[in-house]
From Swiss-Prot:
F(1)F(0) ATP synthase produces ATP from ADP in the presence of a proton or sodium gradient. F-type ATPases consist of two structural domains, F(1) containing the extramembraneous catalytic core and F(0) containing the membrane proton channel, linked together by a central stalk and a peripheral stalk. During catalysis, ATP synthesis in the catalytic domain of F(1) is coupled via a rotary mechanism of the central stalk subunits to proton translocation. The keyword Protease does not apply. It comes from Lepidium virginicum. Keywords: ATP synthesis, CF(0), Chloroplast, Hydrogen ion transport, Ion transport, Membrane, Plastid, Thylakoid, Transmembrane, Transmembrane helix, Transport. It is found in: Plastid, Chloroplast thylakoid membrane. The keyword Aminoacyl-tRNA synthetase does not apply. GO terms for cellular component: chloroplast thylakoid membrane; proton-transporting ATP synthase complex. GO terms for molecular function: proton-transporting ATP synthase activity, rotational mechanism. The gene is atpF. This is ATP synthase subunit b, chloroplastic.
Amino acid sequence: MKNLTDSFVYLGHWPSAGSFGFNTDILATNPINLSVVLGVLIFFGKGVLNDLLDNRKQRILNTIRNSDELREGAIQQLENARARLRKVETEADKFRVNGYSEIEREKLNLINSTDKTLKQLENYKNETILFEQQKTINQVRERVFQQALQGAIGTLNSCLNNELHLRTINANIGMFGTMKETTD
């Protein structure tokens, strides 16, 4: 049991203040390394992330502009349909006796088809905006995850060399051996 507590005391030992040198204790250097890696990721990743978001924002704005242009075209079609409607109404006054019900049906069909077209264009615009937003969010998430993963792998590869890795394994095997002896 004494060996077990000694190993924990050894692992918790920090070098005294005022000394300078390389600290090979992996438990003491990980917070420092992680803070440096996080600082570098934030510093360099922020620009990439901002550029990615700006590009997505421009795509979404272009999509909105295109949808607005389509909407304006539909409004123009509506105005044309209304002009045709006025023309049909004047002709309806002339031919009221011969075909009033048929003209009314054509009028309603024009209004309904134009209204339906406007609704479809509005739905298309909203779906396009939602799709682009989801696509942008997913790509940003994927990019951030990849950058964090690459940073973590780089940190692990730079921190663990073969000698340090073997010493850590041997220390853990020794701890497990002493734990087994104390339990027996």
